[in-house]
Amino acid sequence: MSDELIYKSAKELLGLFQRKEASPVEAIRAVLERVEERDKDINAFILVDEGSALAQARDSEARWSNGNPKGLLDGVPISIKDMFLTKGWPTLKGSLTIDPKGPWEEDAPCVARVREHGAVIFGKTTMPEFGWKGVGDCELTGITRNPWNLDKTPGGSSAGAAAAIAARMGPLAIGGDGGGSIRIPSSFTGVFGIKANYG
């Protein structure tokens, strides 16, 4: 079953958790195994925190076992574009100019919301420096590649987010879009992306 879990949508995972046909721990283990297998070629992640992810998944599993899920995403693995503050992890925005020592003590609002709903935040995805271009390379992390053709770009600036989803390294990712930074990589990798409205 664990191999099959990487092909499930967030909605399908929630149904499996509710019916006790799979657990959040099984889901995140499947994703982490997939990242280990695929990301050495794709380079979608700047950070993956296995220990934190498993701890979050165990907490989620306990809530599901008690019939008390925390919110709309409880137990669903999600990655965060490295432009958004994420408590406990550096946010480097693809740049060598930001000191990774931190302190990193708060979540961006979008990260806080998915955390409040029980999502299992497992890693941060790559982006070009400060999101200034529509491809996925920077001096900090190197080149992020399109999973469908490693000689091609996944687009940008949410390069790692789109590449991760296309390669089944998690069902959900938070990206950011001011001028195409979700829409471009979504179109380049064949995944579904939403640019939220302002306000």
Regions of interest found by a model, annotated:
Residues L72-C110:
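Enzymes and membrane/adaptor proteins characterized by extended Gly/Ser/Thr/Asp/Glu-rich
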Residues M1-D49:
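An N-terminal boundary/leader segment
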Residues G51-R58, G118-A119, P128:
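Long amphipathic alpha-helix in the N-terminal Rossmann-like dinucleotide-binding domain
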Residues L13-F17, A57-S60, A161:
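Generic hydrophobic alpha-helical segments
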Residues S60-P77:
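Immediate post-signal peptide segment of exported/extracytoplasmic ligand-binding proteins
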Residues W104-G199:
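Short glycine/serine-rich loop segments
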Residues V31, A53, G75, K81, ...:
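Conserved hydrophobic/aromatic pocket- or pore-lining residues that grip, position, or stack substrates
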